Regions:
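Short, well-ordered strand-loop elements centered on a beta-strand within folded domains, enriched
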Residues: 18-23, 43, 95-102
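Intrinsically disordered, low-complexity acidic/polar segments
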Residues: 52-54, 76, 92, 106-110
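"Short basic amphipathic alpha-helical interaction patches in structured regions
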Residues: 57-61, 79-86, 100, 114
Length: 136
């Protein structure tokens, strides 16, 4: 296994036909490449307890959630993962959110879904390209 510092976390969701990125204010965090046969990564985020309801709603949906993380340095390009919330733990005034998932190629999977949603909303041409780039 390889362990790295988690320096940035964004949750990417579709809300009211729009793709929304929510920046999560990290207190601390780790990201672990489990190097298993399934190419699984563990993302552990320590955040303020005021995020509890936000993460509970996501967890209760029992759906996969796309996230972007910055690994080791805030200046690094974000890596995109498809994850699910494994657990949420109370730690004093904070919560520890454990996500399990797989790193994805930005040209595939959920990104294609995001592009399809934009096309369905009527975006086309340069406006589509601009909107799509703003989401990446």
């Amino acid at each position: 296994m390889k362990t790295f510092l988690l320096k940035g976390l964004q949750i990417i969701e579709s809300q009211n036909e729009e793709i929304v990125k929510t920046d999560i204010n990290l207190l601390d965090g780790l990201i672990i490449n489990r190097e298993d046969d399934n190419n699984t990564w563990l993302i552990e985020a320590l955040v303020d307890k005021n995020y509890l309801d936000f993460f509970k709603v996501i967890q209760e949906k029992e759906e996969q959630v796309m996230i972007e993380v910055k690994i080791s340095k805030t200046t690094n390009a974000p890596a995109t993962f498809i994850t699910s919330i494994d657990s949420i733990n109370n730690i004093g005034k904070h919560i520890n959110v454990m996500l399990m998932g797989k790193i994805i190629d930005k040209r595939k999977s959920k990104i294609e879904e995001m592009l399809s949603e934009l096309i369905e909303k009527g975006y086309e041409g340069e406006i589509l390209l601009t909107k799509f780039k703003s989401l990446l």
